[in-house]
From Swiss-Prot:
Top-level taxonomy: Eukaryota, Fungi, Dikarya, Ascomycota, Taphrinomycotina
EC number: 4.2.1.33
Cofactor stoichiometry and binding remark: Binds 1 [4Fe-4S] cluster per subunit.
Function comment: Catalyzes the isomerization between 2-isopropylmalate and 3-isopropylmalate, via the formation of 2-isopropylmaleate.
InterPro entries on file: 3-IsopropMal_deHydase_lsu, 3-IsopropMal_deHydase_ssu, 3-IsopropMal_deHydtase_ssu/lsu, Acnase/IPM_dHydase_lsu_aba_1/3, Acoase/IPM_deHydtase_lsu_aba, Aconitase/3IPM_dehydase_swvl, Aconitase_4Fe-4S_BS, Aconitase_4Fe-4S_dom
Pathway terms, separated by semicolons: Amino-acid biosynthesis; L-leucine biosynthesis; L-leucine from 3-methyl-2-oxobutanoate: step 2/4
UniProt catalytic activity: (2R,3S)-3-isopropylmalate = (2S)-2-isopropylmalate
Species of provenance: Schizosaccharomyces pombe (strain 972 / ATCC 24843) (Fission yeast)
An MF annotation (GO) of this entry: metal ion binding
Binding-site list for [4Fe-4S] cluster: 359, 420, 423
Keyword Lipid metabolism: no
Keywords (A to Z) from UniProt: 4Fe-4S, Amino-acid biosynthesis, Branched-chain amino acid biosynthesis, Iron, Iron-sulfur, Leucine biosynthesis, Lyase, Metal-binding, Phosphoprotein
Protein name: 3-isopropylmalate dehydratase
Amino acid sequence: MSPSVASPKTLYDKVWDSHVVDLQEDGTCLLYIDRHLIHEVTSPQAFEGLRTAGRKVRHPELALATVDHNIPTDPRKDMKDIASFIHQPDSRTQVLALENNIKEFGLTYYGMNDRRQGIVHVIGPEQGFTLPGTTLVCGDSHTSTHGAFGALAFGIGTSEVEHVLATQTILQRKSKNMRIRVNGKLPEGIASKDLILHIIGVIGTAGGTGSVIEFCGEAIEGLSMEARMSMCNMSIEAGARAGMIAPDATTFEYVKNRPLAPKGDDWEQAVAYWKTLRSDENAKYDIEVEINAADVLPTVTWGTSPQDVIPINGNIPDPAHVKDNVRAASIQRSLEYMGLKPNTSIVSYPIDKVFIGSCTNSRIEDLRLAAAVVKGRKVAANVKDAMIVPGSGLVKKMAEAEGLDQIFIEAGFDWREAGCSMCLGMNPDQLKPYERCASTSNRNFEGRQGAKGRTHLVSPAMAAAAAIKGHLCNVREFFGDVSNGSPSIITNKNYDPSHDVEGDIGLSVDDATDAVTDADGIATNVAGSVSSGSAGIPKFTVVEGIAAPLPMANVDTDKIIPKQFLKTIKRTGLGQFAFYEIRYDADGKEIPDFVLNREPYRHATVLVAHDNFGCGSSREHAPWALNDFGIRVIIAPSFADIFFNNCFKNGMLPIPTPIEQVNDMMKAAENQVKFSVDLVNQTITYGDKQVKFDVEPFRKHCLVNGLDDIGLTLQKETMIDAFEAAREENFPWMNIKRSRARLSPVKSNKQSSSRNDW
């Protein structure tokens, strides 16, 4: 009998298979997590869960925390303490809660007093925390960014943040393999941002649902690491669970000598292994897409979904020419929201603001490209504000060493401190109603950058060009100043931040208080008492009641719960704010026509919607808001992966259902027919009709019994121990404790370090 030959594997297969701790009969895997990034918005409830259950963080050294979403990007030279610097009470609450939690649980933290602070998806690669072949998670959907290194990186909800902290593992089912090959070289002046927007326009925001995308081809191989990060960053906007690019010499050169990268023999072993992380010849993919690089033009979004893209020389679409009624209605709503007319040129609309920043485009390469366009020019008079927000304190410092800050300042740009800034309106950097913005961020959802704000997604060079012209324009008009990834600007590229050991700005975490106050004014002791166990989730057997019809596709998480309501340290109280932008008018009064404002739908327990429900963020606030309203079941043809997963963590049941059945249920809901959803028997009964539905056995078991995932996982601690022992032997470079680099746990005294820059 001939020996068996292993089947060819994809890059995703290889990384996944090397991290499986346990495989259950139904296909659910216990997956080991190598790296965990943490920020202030999605972590408070996770730490509170640990505290309530009396659990510790299993591996504090494998977590890295920072603040980014809520913090102001104002100058910090006069900052005395966090409490006085952050004026928004709810933002201050989350930042102080994180700092207290970090102190209590002993994690590494880059706070506002540390020049290494920045956006989580900038500082991870910058520090060498992100490595090829690792699994990396964060309570943020754009964790997919790190897939540029050949890591399996994905966003998780708060319940899973708690699970990873407690067990260093996560429960997952394997996604499908999807390959997007980009053939040929990108034309002159085309950035990776143009490419990923083009791809999303081709496949749609649900094109990658249920899949991990591997990007490959000549165009991808020719990208820098920072450009690759922009690609993988927006794989989530394509609906994917993650995006990956095989590591190569470009990857290794970027990682080498980073503070947390392997050193010496560990480095040689690591690179030898990383070179094997390429898809095997004849590896099988479930979905394959071919893109011609020559087809990609400077690209801009016109609507309120990342799939609403046109080339800069294109016209705005006309819903009258769209046959699909749901899609036509979506286009019409987007046109009204964006203040655009069909069949007009996108360049004919003046802009009010420009934002260059975010985890998509705030790295040094992005700033160099923008500076090449800006140099020697002035921001147009009609542009009220043009902001440059570096992705980290070290990016800022590098840009200043190269003189980029002076180029921007002399042109009339505002040079800011590191943070998420205007990517989402959770901090003071926001659009006012009806302001139009050229933005290098990743989402153009309604209200994303501020209530009623209008967002056009573009590359850094395109954003810079728009600032100079005063309207969206073709960056190729600036040729001679910018080419494909090579700006004609002289910069001090010999500056090496690894030689920079200037100290922090002198603020200790002990300047925070031991008690923080939630937005409703209730004081919460974040070091409170510990109970003997976890509360688990509510049991789910049968849900009966009225179903609310919501005939909308691509209902994103920002629409379910707008960003201004995410600044809480509790899981409850969000139901009143669900669908706020379409449920209430500008005065906060109910819009009578919205379904949840009408009887009997005010008391709905079931929601019936269209495709790709829950697309967008990994934040668990969306299911919290629906659950708090009273919705326990959501029926739709398809769901965004992270939202789907988050529902189960909160005792809710999302049911993917064929479109024909959804349409029939939508009519029944409109006629106020009562629904009964029986999870035990897996049936939906409405009127005289009954349909069956599928649900994964393990998820069903947990819902029906109200089981705590963490408690179940801790029963397999022996398996986790064995996996970790083998990991230490086979992949020694993955253990942060072996690194010669210095991590800085949060200080417990008023003395500030004098050497904590990289």
